[in-house]
């Protein structure tokens, strides 16, 4: 008796879940990269901000390598087009597995630029164990990338747990980020 009710509740949730917006600027932060015999380079991740289609020209960032989508899948289904919010596998031509890493981003050429300087609105957790000082070394997690960097507090030298502030994070190596992206600072 509980299973039908559960299924009905799940169906209601699915029907009321908003679809991810298609902003026309697709990007796929790579969480896995591998090579399959007879196919070549395959990358996986969650597609954001736009759609990819078979045949699309793409670039890997921050590497700046150009390629093309030979094939794509979502949940083991071959498709001609993948939409925002879907877990997607891209079979790439022109980019080798050895040239990509977790945290790289596949995008359309000319739509994103890698950056090593992030301007953020930061909310410091109330139960953080220490104050955050200007120029503190941190790790950030954004998309599927992990990077080291330093915090530059704007207008103050110390941020106490529970406080909010605008700050800059100067990264040791570039990432692809868009306005409104969320990140984790450790």
Report each predicted region and the residues it spans.
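Conserved catalytic-core segments of large NTP-driven translation/proteostasis enzymes
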Residues: 1-128, 165
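C-terminal effector modules of nucleic-acid-centric enzymes and ribosome-associated factors
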Residues: 95-186
């Amino acid at each position: 008796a509980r299973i039908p009710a559960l299924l009905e509740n799940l169906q209601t949730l699915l029907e009321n879940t908003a679809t991810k917006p298609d902003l026309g600027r697709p990007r796929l932060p790579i969480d896995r990269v591998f090579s399959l015999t007879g196919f070549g380079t395959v990358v996986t991740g969650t597609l954001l901000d736009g759609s990819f289609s078979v045949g699309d020209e793409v670039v890997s960032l921050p590497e700046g390598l150009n390629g093309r989508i030979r094939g794509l899948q979502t949940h083991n289904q071959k498709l001609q087009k993948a939409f925002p919010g879907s877990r997607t596998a891209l079979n790439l031509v022109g980019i080798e597995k050895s040239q990509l890493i977790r945290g790289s981003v596949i995008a359309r050429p000319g739509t994103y630029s890698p950056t090593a300087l992030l301007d953020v609105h930061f909310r410091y957790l109330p139960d953080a164990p220490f104050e955050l000082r200007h120029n503190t070394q941190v790790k950030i997690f954004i998309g599927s990338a992990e990077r080291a960097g330093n915090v530059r507090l704007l207008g103050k030298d110390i941020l106490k747990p529970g406080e909010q502030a605008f700050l800059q994070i100067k990264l040791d190596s570039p990432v692809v980020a868009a306005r409104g992206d969320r990140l984790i600072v450790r």
